[in-house]
Amino acid sequence: MSRSIKKGPFVHAGLLKKIEEMNQNGDKKVIKTWSRSSTIFPQMIGHTIAVHDGRKHIPVYVTEDMVGHKLGEFVLTRTFKGHIKNEKTSKRK
């Protein structure tokens, strides 16, 4: 179910404030955030945002195609290591 149009998209207030300040000053520093549920706005295009995955911050460079999506969509929280091949069951006699 999508978010109500009446409410509008969610973005963390502190994150939006930092983005607007950097746009005014012309800075391009990496911004750390824990807000994975924030929607990507057009003002964020061209910035690098380090999104927390539960362990560390993963840098995400925001492009035009990402507008409207959430920050957490671009950072995986689980790492799949693969299934271990069992030597005994794979050999047939």
Curated annotation (Swiss-Prot):
<dbReference type="GO" id="GO:0005737">
    <property type="term" value="C:cytoplasm"/>
</dbReference>
<keyword id="KW-0699">rRNA-binding</keyword>
<keyword id="KW-0687">Ribonucleoprotein</keyword>
<keyword id="KW-0694">RNA-binding</keyword>
<dbReference type="GO" id="GO:0000028">
    <property type="term" value="P:ribosomal small subunit assembly"/>
</dbReference>
<comment type="function">
    <text>Protein S19 forms a complex with S13 that binds strongly to the 16S ribosomal RNA.</text>
</comment>
<keyword id="KW-0689">Ribosomal protein</keyword>
<dbReference type="GO" id="GO:0019843">
    <property type="term" value="F:rRNA binding"/>
</dbReference>
<protein>
    <recommendedName>
        <fullName>Small ribosomal subunit protein uS19</fullName>
    </recommendedName>
</protein>
<dbReference type="InterPro" id="IPR023575">
    <property type="entry name" value="Ribosomal_uS19_SF"/>
</dbReference>
<dbReference type="InterPro" id="IPR002222">
    <property type="entry name" value="Ribosomal_uS19"/>
</dbReference>
<dbReference type="GO" id="GO:0003735">
    <property type="term" value="F:structural constituent of ribosome"/>
</dbReference>
<dbReference type="GO" id="GO:0015935">
    <property type="term" value="C:small ribosomal subunit"/>
</dbReference>
<dbReference type="Pfam" id="PF00203">
    <property type="entry name" value="Ribosomal_S19"/>
</dbReference>
<dbReference type="GO" id="GO:0006412">
    <property type="term" value="P:translation"/>
</dbReference>
<dbReference type="InterPro" id="IPR005732">
    <property type="entry name" value="Ribosomal_uS19_bac-type"/>
</dbReference>
<dbReference type="InterPro" id="IPR020934">
    <property type="entry name" value="Ribosomal_uS19_CS"/>
</dbReference>
<comment type="similarity">
    <text>Belongs to the universal ribosomal protein uS19 family.</text>
</comment>
